[in-house]
């Protein structure tokens, strides 16, 4: 790996569900892996995100054997090197979003390799609704003309966005989850 490689990771906030199915490291730096549920494909999945520049070696360890592992989109399959029945490695030199699917779509791992952020707004900047690292239960976030919603890496915002106007942006490397929004709550898993 080149000396100019850079990796930024963001610790998961306390209380957020961690995956016990996967472990991820980028250039030797551990990356927190979240556990999540969706409405499709049997629901359970895991995801991890990090920022990098230069080259990155991503090592994924799985509690279950990585039999018949596939990467989607398929154009990234050439990145994959199998190290053992439970470990694979990937090499990347540009941002990516992939799904690592073992034995079909059973508990896939979604990986988000983002470009290192260079122009992040600061708390208190005008027209910026800023969320720092941590868990934030917001309900509805209303955005209007010329506003930016910014989610810092390590922020988990549990709410929904109502945007009405022009020149509205949502940025950052945090997580915006609608699982606590009344629209998605219900008597069951979803």
Outline where the language-model segments fall.
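Extracellular/periplasmic carbohydrate-active domains that bind, remodel
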Residues: 1-190
